[in-house]
Amino acid sequence: MNETILVKIITPLSIALERQAKMVTIPGEDGMFGVLSNHATMIVSLKAGLVQVYIDDIYNPQITYLVSSGVTEVTGSYVNIATETAINVTNLSEAEIATKLQGLQKPLSEQH
């Protein structure tokens, strides 16, 4: 399977990621879901969690981003993930990722 899909992670300030991938897994409001090329078109609410991008194969993610809530647009050729926050956590430990995720999940009233 050589087909790829364009994955974009977009925040209000920048495009955090834009690259071709074999697969991407995304934290939707109804649970995690995976997207390969030629996926059915859909719009999905995004919840805070990990977006894993599989570049070389569909078994080991090479890039991982921690994202806040937002929206995901999926088509057969691309995935646009629009989120308030996107943090590249590829090289962080599980404990560091868990701490950052807790910060994203706090209600806004607790963050100020």
Swiss-Prot record:
Membrane-protein topology: Peripheral membrane protein
SUPFAM superfamilies per the UniProt record, alphabetical: Epsilon subunit of F1F0-ATP synthase N-terminal domain
Gene3D superfamilies recorded: F0F1 ATP synthase delta/epsilon subunit, N-terminal
UniProt KW keywords: ATP synthesis, Cell inner membrane, Cell membrane, CF(1), Hydrogen ion transport, Ion transport, Membrane, Transport
Protein's cellular compartments: Cell inner membrane
Domain of life of the native organism: Bacteria
Pfam families on file: ATP-synt_DE_N
InterPro entries: ATP_synth_F1_dsu/esu (IPR001469), ATP_synth_F1_dsu/esu_N (IPR020546), ATPsynth_dsu/esu_N (IPR036771)
A GO MF label: ATP binding
Tagged with keyword Nucleotidyltransferase: no
GO cellular component terms attached to this protein's record: plasma membrane; proton-transporting ATP synthase complex
Assembly and oligomerization: F-type ATPases have 2 components, CF(1) - the catalytic core - and CF(0) - the membrane proton channel. CF(1) has five subunits: alpha(3), beta(3), gamma(1), delta(1), epsilon(1). CF(0) has three main subunits: a, b and c.
Entry similarity comment: Belongs to the ATPase epsilon chain family.
Its job: Produces ATP from ADP in the presence of a proton gradient across the membrane.
This protein's name: ATP synthase epsilon chain
Provenance organism: Rickettsia akari (strain Hartford)
Gene name per UniProt: atpC
